[in-house]
Amino acid sequence: MSKTKNRNSLLSSHNRTSVSNSTKDELLAMKYVMDKPAIPLYPLNELSNSSESISEQNRYTSNSSTDELTYPDFKPWKDTTHLPKGKSEVEVEKLNNEAYLNKGYFEGPSVANEYYSARNLIQASLFSSSSNCDKVLKELSQHLVNSYRTRNEVINKIKYNSNKFKIPPRVTLTASKKEAWLRDLANPDEPLSNISNKLPHGIKNKMLVDILCSKNIPTSRALWLTKCVLYSELLVLKKKYQSRLPNNPHPVENTTSETFETQWLQEWTHQLVDYFYKFSKDMCNITIQEKKQVYLTKLNYLLNYVQALYIECLLDKSFFLTSILKFLKEGLPLDQSHVSELLAFSRSEGEESSLDKWLVDIDLNYGQRLISITLVKMFWKDILELDYLSKELSELLLLNYYFIERIPTYNTKSSNYSHKQNHTAALSSTLKLKLLSSISDTVNYLFKHNTNVFIIPNYWILVNETLYKILLSDVANSYDSEEQTEIRKQLKLIKYRNESLMLSMKDVQSSNFVDVNTARNLAKDRRRSNSLQQSLSQDTKNNYNSITGKKIPNTVENDNYFINRNSDDTLNIIDQLDRLKLNDTLAEMLIPSSISSSPDNFNDWRVNLKVVIYWAITIYREQMSSSEGILIICNFLKRKVLQNISVKNVNSIKAEFENEILEIIYNLAHCTDVDIIDYNLYVLINELYQLKVITISSYLRKLIASGLFYVSPSADGAQSHNENNSSVETHLAILQNLPVLNNKQCDSILRKWTPNGFNFEEKFEKGKLILKEELVDRLMSNSFDGYCDEKLTYIKNLKVGLKFLLVNWLTNYLKTSITKSPKLIHINPNIITSLYNFYALCDNLTVFFKVLIKFILRNEGKVIICYMDSLYLISKLIIRHFKLVKFIAGKSYESTTTGYELFKLIILNYKDLSTRDNDYYNFSDVWYFIDNAVEKNEPTYGKSSDGNNDNALKHKNFNQLLFAKETVDSPMRIHANSNTPQKNNDSYTATVFRNDLDLLLEAPIKLLNNTDITDFISTLELNVSNEAFNEISNTEESVIIIMEYYFKNIGEFTELHENLCMRLLINSKRSLDMTTRGIFFDIMKHFIINLVRTKPGIEKLITLFKKLMCFEVYQPHELFSTLRSILPRELSHEQMDALKYELLFGNPESDNKNLFNDQALVLRCIRYLYVKRHSNDVFITLLDSFSNEKETFFNSYALKAYNSKVLSFFRQFSISNTKFFMDGLSKVASNSDIISFLNLLIYISEEPIGSSSDLPRLASIIDEFNLPVCQVLIKIIIMNELRDSNKDKSIEKLRYILDMLLNNLKFHFVSYNSYFGELFNYLSWEHKLNILSIFEHNFLCNTEFIVSDDKFTENSVCLMSSDGRTNLLSILKDYFKKFSVSSLNTVTTSKEVFHNLSKFLLKVLQLANADIIGDSRRDAYNTISIFLRILIIHKLSLTSMIIEQDGQDLHFIKNLIALLESKFLCFNNEKLRILLYDLLLLMKSSITSSMILNPDSNLADDMTTDTSHQQHSPSNDYLSRSNPDGTEVGNSNSKYFGVSNISTIPNLSSVFNISEPNISYPLKKYTDDSKILCALMLEESELQKGGDIYALNDSKLILLPSRREALSSAFDILNETQQTVSKKRFKIESYELLEDTGIELNNGCINLSLFDAFTTKENPP
C-alpha cells in the first residue's frame, strides 16, 4: 500500500469521516496496489471434477466455458475472477458502486432479525433438561466430528488411482550423453529430480558395479540406481515368465514367480560377488603407490556399497555369505592328488623345505583372502548365527592357515631376496604375519564360541595339528591354566569326533598313499606340464622307465587304499618315530597326567612310552650311525615331555615317568619273545641317565628289591639251567654298561655274579691314557696329521657306560687344555673329523654339538684358529645331524636351543673369516638351510600390543615358538625370537642375526681374483696362462685343463694341492654358470666320455667321482643322472654296477684308502642325505639290478657286494614306502623270490615262511615294527592260496587263514590298538570285503550276551576265538576302527546284514540298560564301539536299506536312539555317546535326502511334515557344498528339489527327536570380543533394523480395510460395535522402495491411499 495510515483507517472503521480527507483517486489506487493473498482459494467441486486442473499460475480454470466453480460457505459465493469473461464483467460492475466504495464490501443479512431464526427455540429445548443436554451435545459434537471425517474421507482423501508411480524408463544414449548423465548422478548438488526421468540402457550386473565405483557415486544415489536397474530387470523377467505360461498347459508347481525372483536375486548376487572376486585378485598386481591409493579408494567404496546392499536386503544374504567364503577356498590345492601329496610331505623325513618347494607354483592370492576375511568380519554377527556357515568358515580358516604358514616370505626392504626365492606365492613377512594373526584370532573365537563347528572330518587329517597349534600356543595363557586345560579337553573330544567320522576319504587320492619322493617328482612334473592327476603306479612306472630305460608291465592292480590313522594310534606313533616327527601332540601323549575318561585308554601314556622305548631298541629299526635315533628320542623325552611339565606336582609326575621307564627296562629282561638290540638298550639307558631322566640308584634299588640276585650263583649248581638265568644275564649286562665308577652296590653284584669281575676304574684309566696320547696331546701340539681307527680299537670295544664316561672326561679336558694353552691351537678339517669320529664311535654326538662345537666356534679364549674349510665342515655336520641338534635339551625348557646358538656362531665366524680367507665353498646352501630352519616371522598367535606379555614370551612360551613348525610336520624349524633371553655380554640379537642372514642370502657369487689365480697356477705348476681362467671365452678350455691335470695326479696330490686344483675348477664352474647355466655339465660330459674311452681303471674312475661329490662339483643326483646317460654305452654291466653301488653305499676301506679323512666323512654325509631324500631313485636303481638277473635277483651285484647295506635300505624303504616297495618287487621278481627276500628282511634265514601252513609261526612274530614286511608277505601268501578259487572257496580259505592267525597272535602292547587292524590293508578290495564279511558275521552272530535281572548273575558279553583261548572283542574293535577310517569304497549292505544288525541291536540295547560292573564294562564298551563302527562302514548304503526294510516304522532308528539314551552310554561313556549322536545326525541327513529325492518311497502317508527346522537355511546346493559331511540336518528346502508335494515327506523330526549330548559351551566365557572386533563389523541392530526396508516391513504395520461408512447410520454411531476384520502384514521388497523424485503428491513408490492419507485444503475466513 502506498499509504499505510490510509490503509489502517480504511480497515479499522466504517466512519465516513475516515475517508473525508481521501480522494477517490487515492481509494482507487489503493484497490490496485493491494497484495494478492498467497493462499489459493479451493472450490468445492474441483476435487470431484476430473476435467479441472490447476494452471501454472495457480489459478483454477475450466475446460468448459459453461462450468462454474462452487466454493463452500453457508451461502456459497462466487469469485468473479473465476467466472467466464462476460459474467465476470457484470459482477465487477455490481461491485463498483458508491455504497461499497464508501462503506466497503458487505453482505446483507439473510434474515431481517436473528430472533426470527430457530436458534432461540433450539437453545431452549437443549437446556430445558439437564439429563438430555449432555447426550444431545455429545451427539451434536459427534456429528460435527463426523462431518470433518467425512470431508477428509470423501473430499480431501487421496484417491488410490491418483498414484502414477513408475520406474524411470531405460533409453539408449550416446556415449557423451551417458557420461553426462552419470556425471550428474555423481554430483550431489544436482537434484535427482532433474535426471530421474530416464536411465541409460545397458547398465546392469558387473557394469553397474564398476560404474558406481569408478564414478564414486554417493551411496544413496548408488542404491537408487541399483534398485531401478534391479526392478527393471525383474519386470522383464516377469513378462517373459507370463508370456510362457499359456504355452505350457501343465506348469511345474514349484516354478513360480517367487522362484524366478529368488534366481534373479541370486544371479545379481553372483555378479556382485564375481566382480568382488576379480577385483580382489587384482590386489597382488598393484605395485605403484599411485595405483595403490586408487585401489584402496575403490575398495573402500565397494565395502560401503556392499554393506548398504546387505543392510537393505538387495542381495541374497545366504548366497552372498556362502560365496564370500569361497574366496578363502579358491586357489587352495585340495584336489585328490594335492591332498595325497600334502599328506606325503607331512610324513617327509627330509630336513629340506620340501613342502615350500612343492608350493612353488601354487598362487595363494592374498588379495582375495584379505578381502574375504574383511567381509567375514563385516558380517560376522550373521555368520556366527548360522552353524553351517561357521563350520565352513572354520574349515577354510584352518586350511588357509595351513598353507599360508608354509609359503615363503620375503623382506620388503630387499628385492634381490624375493627374486632369489623364486616363489610366485611369496608374501612379505609383515603381510604374512598379519594374515596369520587375523586367522588365528578368528579361529580362537570360533572354537570358544561353539566347538561343534569344528566337526570337519573331510580335511581333519590336514588341519588338526594346525588347530592344536593355534589354540595351545597362546602366550597369554600358561600350560596349566584353567582355560588351557578346558581347551585341551575339548580338543580331545573334537579330535575323537572327527577321526571317528573320517569315512570314505573322497578327497584323497584313491590309489594309494603317495610317498614324499613321489610327491617331489609330481611337483617337478607339475612345473613342466601343470598336471596333477598322476597316480603312484603311473609315477612309479615313469620313474622306473626314466631311470632304467625299461618298461614295467601292468601286472599289479590299483586297489583303493589309503592309510589314515588317529593321532593316538600305536602305528601312528611308530610312524612319527620313524620319520622323527616329534611334535607336541606326541609329547602330550607321553605325559603321565594325560589321562582320558575312556576305560580303553586310562593308562595309554604308559603304553605309548613303552612303544617309544621298544622302537629305540627293536631289531627291526636301525638307529643310524652313532645311535642318532636313540639320542634324538632321549632328548625329546627330556625337553618336550619332562621340561614341558609345569603343573604343581611336577616332581611326582617326573618320578612316575622315571619309574615307568625303569619298569619297562626291567620287564624287557624277562621277555623272551621280544627281538631287541642289546647295544641299543645300553645306549638308551646311558643317554637317559646322562640327561637325568632316570637315575642309576633307582634302577639298582628296583633290581635289589626284586630278589633276583638274592641267591648266590654258587648256591645252586644248576643255576645255569635256571629259568631266571636269561634275566640275570640281561641285568648283569646292563650293570656292566652303566656309566658308574665306585658304585658299591653295582660293584658288589658284578663281583658276585661275574667270574672275572668287572673293573670299571682300570678300564677307564686306560681309556683316558689312550685319548690323551692320540687326541689331546697331538691337538695341543698342532701335530695332528692323521687319524687311525686302529689306535682307538680299545675304546671301541669298551662297554657303553665307559664310553660315555670317557666322552665327558675328554670334553672337559679338551676345554680346560685349550683355554689354558699358551699358544694358538689350529683346528683344521682333519681335527674336526677325528673328534667327530670319536664321539660317533662312543654314541655321544649330543655332547659333540652341544659342548665341543659350541666351544670351538665361540673361541672365548681367542686361542683357536679356524678357517673356512673347518667352518664349512662344521656347517655340513650340523645340517647332517640337524634333527639331533634341534632336540638337544638344555638346562631347562626356557633355555635357547642349541641349533639357534650354533647358527649364530656360524654366521659370526663366517663374517670374521670372510675378511681374511677366500670362500670357494658352497656356503649359499648353508644360508638357505638356515633360512628354512629359522622362523622368519614373529609369533602369529596370542599377541598383545602392549608389553605385558613380554615376560611370558621370554620364558615358557618362547620354546613353543621355537618348536612351532613341528606341530605341522614341515621341516623342523627354530625361531630366532628377538625376545630371547640374552646373556649380559651377548649383543648379537635375533634381529641382527636375521639381517645378517638376509645379507648373506643376497651376497653375489665371488670369483677368484687374478692374484689368487696366479698363485694357484704357480703352486700347482700348471703350464697355462692366467687368461685361460680370466676370460670367459677360455673358461671351457680351463675346465678341460684342470680335469686332465687332476685325473692324472689323482691319488698323488697332497691335500693342499688338491684343494687348490678344485678351487680353480669351482671358479671356472661359477664363471660358466654366470653366463650360460648348464654348459659346465655339458663340458664335463664330454670330458667323462673321452676319459672313459681311454680305459682307465674302474677304481681310479670311482675315486674321481667321489672327489667330485666331496668338493660339491656335482650334487649326487646330478652325477647319477649324468652317469646314467653316458656310461652304459661305454662300460660293461659289471663295471656300471661296481661304479654306481660304490658311489651309493661305499666301502669304508676304499674310502679311507682313496680319500682324506675329512673327505671320507663328507662323502658319508652326502650319501646319507642322498639316499634319504632320493630313496625312490635308489630303490628303482636296485630294481634295475634285480631285473637283469636271469635266475634270481639274489645273484645281483648289489646284494653280493653290499648285502648288509642293501638289506638295511630295503628294511627302511619298506617302512616308509610300503606300497611302492610291494609293487616294485612284484614287477621284477617271482613270488618265491619275494617270499625269500621278505623272510630275510625279518631275519628269518632258515625255514622261511611261505604258505598258509606257516601262518601260525608268522602270527607269533608279527608286531608293530615288522608289520610292513608282514603285510606284503601275507598278501603274497593269500594270493597264492586263493588263486583260481571261486567266491565260496575263497571265503572258506580266508576263514581258515583268519582262524589260524587269531589263534596265534601275540601283542607286545595292547590288542585294542595294535597292528591287526592294518594287517590286511594291501589285499585286493575283493579279499578285504570278504574278510570284513567274515568278521562281521562272526561278531553279529557269535557274540554271547549274558543279561539277567538276577542280581547274583553278572551281566557280560564276549566273543571267543575258535580255540576258546582269546576274547576277540578288543582285537576286532581295532580292525573295524581302522577299516572305517581307511576305506575308500562304499560297502554294500545286504538284507542279511541288516537283519543281523537289527537283531544284534536289540541285544546291545538290553545289555546297555543292565547293570554292568568290573571288567565286563570294557567288553561292553568294545561291543558297542564295534557295532557303531560297522554302522559307519555301511553308512552310505545303510540308508537305502533302512528305508526299504524299515521305512514304515523306523524301528531300527528308534532303537538306536534308545541306545543313545541307555544307562551305559549316559554314564561315563561320553565318547561313545557322542559318536552315536554324530552317526544319527548323518543318518538323519541321508534318510531325509533320500526321502525328498524319492517321494514315492513306501512311507506312512498320514505323517505330516515339520518344516520348522527349514528356517534360516540356504539352498540345497549351498548346503551340500558348505556341509559335505552332512552333519547339519534339516537345512533343505523343498523348492530346490524336484518334489511335487512336500507334504508326502514323513515327520522325521519326531523320530529323530534327539538332544545334543552336551549343549553347554564351557569355553564361551573365555571369548575375547576384542580379538575379532573391527570398525567395519556391523552390529546386530544395524543388521536387524539398520535399513529403510526394516522400518517399512516392521511387524506392527498391517493392512486393514478403510472405513467408508462413517455417515451411513449417523444417529447409531454411539451404539456402534467394533467388528473383527482380517489383518494382513504389510510387506514391500527392497528393490521396490525407491526415492520419490517427482513433484506430484502421490507419485511415490508407496501409494499414500494405503495410509488413508488426505490433504487439508481450507480457504481463508
From Swiss-Prot:
Cellular localization per UniProt: Nucleus
Alphabetic keyword roster: Activator, Nucleus, Repressor, Transcription, Transcription regulation
Iron-sulfur recorded as keyword: no
GO biological process: regulation of transcription by RNA polymerase II
One GO term describing the cellular component: mediator complex
Molecular function GO terms recorded: transcription coregulator activity
Domain of life: Eukaryota
Keyword Mitochondrion: no
UniProt biased composition (Polar residues): 7-22, 539-548, 1505-1527
Segments of this protein annotated with the region Disordered: 1-22, 524-550, 1501-1527
InterPro entries assigned to the protein according to its UniProt record, in alphabetical order: Mediator_Med12
Purpose: Component of the SRB8-11 complex. The SRB8-11 complex is a regulatory module of the Mediator complex which is itself involved in regulation of basal and activated RNA polymerase II-dependent transcription. The SRB8-11 complex may be involved in the transcriptional repression of a subset of genes regulated by Mediator. It may inhibit the association of the Mediator complex with RNA polymerase II to form the holoenzyme complex.
Family classification: Belongs to the Mediator complex subunit 12 family.
Subunit structure: Component of the SRB8-11 complex, which itself associates with the Mediator complex.
Protein known as: Mediator of RNA polymerase II transcription subunit 12
Native source organism of the sequence: Debaryomyces hansenii (strain ATCC 36239 / CBS 767 / BCRC 21394 / JCM 1990 / NBRC 0083 / IGC 2968)
Lineage: Eukaryota, Fungi, Dikarya, Ascomycota, Saccharomycotina
